[in-house]
Amino acid sequence: EQCNVDDFLMITYTRAAAAELRGKIAAELSARVARQPEDDHLRRQLLRVYRADIKTVDAFCGSLLRENTHLLRPVDGRSLTPDFRVLDEQEGQVLRSRVLERVVEDFYQKIQDGDQRARLLADTLGAGRDDRRLTELVLELYDKLQSHPYPLRWLAEQRRQWEHLPEHLADTPYGRIMMDRTLSAAAFWEEKLRSAAGEMEQYPKVQKAYQGPFLAVAEALSAYPAAAARGFDAMGEVNPAFPRLGAVRNAEDEAFKERMKALKDRCAKAVKAQQAVYAVGEEAYLEDLREMGPAILALMELTASFTAAYQQEKVRRNCADFSDQEHYAIEILTTPDGTPTGLARQVAGRYREIMVDEYQDTNEVQNCIFSAISRQEQNLFTVGDVYSYSVFQAPRNHHYRHHKDYGYGKT
């Protein structure tokens, strides 16, 4: 097709990678022009490649913001201007510390005014004698918030859940995470064990001693989904412990036998770790959550206060950090319900294709941006390594949806 190179948005994750990619495209175009000097279209691409959008997420968001700061919602009566400055890491840390110091002073004033949640949080962390743990937790939670497309909305949702704890642990985020990890691990090891049992058919001696135990544990692991439907305590009743493996003398392939033993040991260790989670019953976990609830709510309120104060101070100084640029981009590209704005549709119209490298390293914030500026993800092409995630990580299924008719490339 007679495409122009600047009809594409190409996202990489370092400036060096962006420069390298631009250089490779320019070199390839030069080589083709040398072979086809009469091709005017190719010659035009040599000029266009230097204005093509080949950049990092930060650079893309920064350019978008400088063109559209007028669309940002004011913060305490102020807004960023197009000449806003991006804070470097050290500046950001210094400014965060100053703002947090003021916010913590207000927190102690709340305690003096009789705020019981604030007092419980302070007592739990030993605050007053040493504020370091309190400030560390606020900054840790703040940093985690930045991985969400709508941080304060997400925090408000968590606060509502802590204010009204469900009757069952499976209905809490904490319980769901534990159970989902177990289900993911069980599915992973069940597949591994069944596959290994199939391989054993080539080695009758190993098969006779090992296949039965492997299949027995695989079958036990398959019981986890049904147990999860019954609740948290039912998960603890599943017992996928390995029976003792039989002895194998003069195995057909000693290396294969040792590989099977090593697989068994890894599986047994992983299963044991999961079973330990359920050694404490559901009611004990729920009681802990009820006791921690007021302190957790106070921590969330303190973090929300810090987030707002820090944002106000940055806007007052007409500056932003890297995560701000991404969140501001979401603000002007999506409505509160996540629908693309007019600006998003306008940006989407610029590009035939949006290509994202190292997609496994994207977070929900960046994924939201890519989704907003694509045509319902039909022109979004992503390349990433599906195997970069641990089996125990939370599911990231949105990374593995197929866009258009492409399969995912391999890194």
Descriptions of predicted regions:
Residues E1-R73, E313, R317-S323, Y328-E331, ...:
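P-loop NTPase Walker
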Residues D7, R132-A320:
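Conserved ATP-driven helicase/translocase motor core recognized via long
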Residues L9, R51, R352-E353, N379-L380:
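The start of beta-strands in P-loop NTPase/AAA+ ATPase cores
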Residues A27, A31, A262-A276, E282, ...:
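Conserved RecA-like helicase ATPase core segment
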Residues L46-D53, L72-Y150, E258-C267, V271-Y278, ...:
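ATP-hydrolysis module of ASCE/P-loop NTPase motor domains
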Residues A52-S63, A122-S147, L299-S305, A320-L333:
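Core structural elements
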Residues P336-E353, I373-Q376:
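Short basic/glycine-enriched coil/helix segment immediately N-terminal to the Walker B
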